[in-house]
Each structure stands twice: as structure tokens, then as C-alpha cells.
């Protein structure tokens, strides 16, 4: 077998810049959540599409998808012992809703549930909410819209109050956001620092 020989590079001339290559990488900015005049809700990022962007990342990359799905499956484990009890009219069980909530936490850093109160102040039904359809209100509560892209959906957003066990009427949104220092209105996923890679 022949020996492989390496040749040492010639001494670099500090005035010769012809061999310098500059690489610039796109920066994935951390979204800014701010109030906008004339709107009753807090925008979710500069263009109000940050949840859709996170969904795009999840669906676009096989590795990213596999890591997040695996993490969610690991957290869910075997589910609840009695988790096959229906929680709503559509037949979603506690385990079904829990799986969706866990995946939302892994992708977005939080989840939303619609709580439907019945007579006597008891919770009648629980539904998982598509995370991308809700925006936090400036005062309290949430705003629902099937799509926040005004080119697709011209409907006005619908106000839904935040969960309040002291006011058990109608439908309310229960919100869970993971804690992250410096965030006020919306959570950030734990992988936010790796979005540039």
C-alpha cells in the first residue's frame, strides 16, 4: 500500500486576499411580540406568523421532525392509566388530547385547550386547540381565526375569554406556556437557539 503524503501549505502572504472566502449565514431572529395600534391582540412575531414558521420547520426537516416527535413520544410514555375516557363529543380521549398538547409544547413551547363549561359550574368538554389559530388579547383572553393570513381568510377574529374557574360559563381558553426569561406574551421553543443551524 502506498504511503499518503501531505504537502504543507506555502507561507501565506498577508497582503494576498485572493484566497479569502467570506461565508455569511442567515440569522434566524428571535421574534418580537408587541402590541399594535388598532388591534385587540398581540402580534405573534413581526409578521404575526411565528407559529406557522415553527410548523414549517417541523414539517420541512426530517431530522428536526424525528427529534421533536421522538421527544414528544418519550414524554407521553404509556399515557394515562385510565386515559381512554372521551373528553368531548368528537370522541377525543384524555390520551389523545395529551399527545397533542405534548407535541405543541415541544414545537411551540406551550399549548391551548378549549374548556366548555356545563351547568352547575362543571367542566363539560375539553378540546385541543390548533396552536396557530389563537393570538393573545391585549387585556385578557384570546382571539381565534382559522388562518391569520388575511389573503386567505377575510373573517374577523373571534374573542374567547381566558380560563377562569371563578367564572364557569361558556367556552374559555386554558393556556400553558413554558417559562423563559424575557418573554411576556408568548413562549419560545427550547430549540430556538439552534434555528440558525
Protein language model regions, located:
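Structured, contiguous alpha/beta core segments that scaffold functional sites
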Residues: 1-197
Amino acid at each position: 500500500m502506498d504511503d499518503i503524503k501531505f504537502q504543507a501549505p506555502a507561507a501565506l502572504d498577508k497582503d494576498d486576499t485572493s484566497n479569502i472566502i467570506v461565508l455569511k449565514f442567515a440569522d434566524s431572529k428571535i421574534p418580537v411580540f408587541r402590541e399594535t395600534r388598532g388591534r385587540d391582540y398581540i402580534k405573534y412575531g413581526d409578521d404575526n406568523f411565528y407559529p406557522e414558521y415553527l410548523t414549517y420547520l417541523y414539517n420541512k426537516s426530517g431530522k428536526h421532525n424525528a427529534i421533536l416527535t421522538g421527544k414528544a413520544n418519550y414524554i407521553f410514555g404509556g399515557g394515562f392509566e385510565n386515559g381512554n375516557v372521551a373528553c368531548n363529543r368528537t370522541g377525543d380521549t384524555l390520551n389523545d388530547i395529551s399527545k397533542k398538547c405534548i407535541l405543541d409544547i415541544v414545537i411551540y413551547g406551550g399549548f391551548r385547550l378549549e374548556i366548555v363549561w356545563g351547568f352547575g359550574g362543571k367542566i363539560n368538554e375539553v378540546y385541543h386547540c390548533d396552536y396557530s389559530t389563537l393570538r393573545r388579547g391585549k387585556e385578557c383572553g384570546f382571539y381565534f381565526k382559522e388562518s391569520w393570513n388575511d389573503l386567505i381568510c377575510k373573517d374577523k377574529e373571534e374573542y374567547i375569554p381566558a380560563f377562569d374557574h371563578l367564572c364557569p360559563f361558556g367556552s374559555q381558553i386554558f393556556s400553558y406556556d413554558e417559562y423563559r426569561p424575557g418573554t411576556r406574551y408568548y413562549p419560545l421553543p427550547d430549540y430556538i437557539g439552534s434555528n440558525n443551524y
